[in-house]
Amino acid sequence: LYEFLAGSKNLGKSSISNHIKNDQFVLKDNYKTYLSFFDGSMDDDSLGRELISLAKELNIEIFEFNEIKNFDTEGNIDKHYFDKIILAVGPWSKMLLEQNNIKSQKDIDFIKGSHLIINRKSEFGLMFSGICKSRYIFALPYKDFTLLGTTEEKVSHPELPEISKNEIKYLIDSFNQIL
């Protein structure tokens, strides 16, 4: 489906196969089939700058580097009125809505992604279950390296998410189990 929707912007073909066509990765015998896939890799900072530039070209007034604490659903921020408020603060949305007594239609869990860049080049992406068998891990090409990660660990607060030594060990051990 991704390939169909992407059309000419397709990054690569996903496939299910019985072997890997790359000397860098050799699956252990008990892994008979694998899913190879391609995922986008983006520069979030560059994308953000591009969107800000485009918005300014459209005469949209943007207020950057301003801490907003008090707002309502009518467009009021402190003592100013705005036609629209875009709350683009990721995991902090839940806390800001609660602080301003605004009921959300969605419940937000705080999760963190754990990612490692390992010194091993890959030309395709893999997704596999980790050693605990309840989480999936991905290994994606990233420049001349491999990006190894997962995004399924709940945390109690979004501030300063850090990868733990246990999570590093989990990712590496899980990756090593299939090679």
Task: Please place each PLM-identified region on the residue numbering.
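Core beta-strand elements of the Rossmann-like FAD/NAD(P) dinucleotide-binding domain
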Residues: 77-84, 88
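Active-site substrate-recognition segment that forms the wall
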Residues: 87-179
